[in-house]
């Protein structure tokens, strides 16, 4: 009887331990601070968009992300909450972000882990234009503008380049599809594959684009 009790305790302990182990972080070629935490923000797809209907929504020139974009009140509230959760708590006033030459906010003045909301875009990891979920917190995170790779800014604006390029690869085979990228797509990928690239390693795709290669 004692042996059975000890075995049950052991099994329960192992189960609790396994439940606390976060999923393994996917291999990514860039530094960790340009990506969201894969546990908090793994990405989430829009259940209303699938491979069969992309011609009616994301690839349709008449369709716009404005139709499904969440209100600013929601994303601002979530951004404030997630900044705390992500540990972005280094105090920085708006005055510290002002460029004296222009009198405007200059995000290159943002320090690492700044608590100033102007230093971030509350971004969809899988973008709306690529079938991402509009409101699921697992698909949203405060993406910094001023993160760098080898001294080069690599943040929210650079990810925007990838988002449009992936969109055009997803829509490559759709007749009359809208174009979101100034860089022409050369191959067709599935909606699912495009979302995997964006959630997995958008920066690897950015490097491929920079070399004149497709993301696949």
Describe the role of every protein-language-model region:
Residues 3-121, 128-216:
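Nuclease and nuclease-like effector domains acting on nucleic acids or nucleotide cofactors
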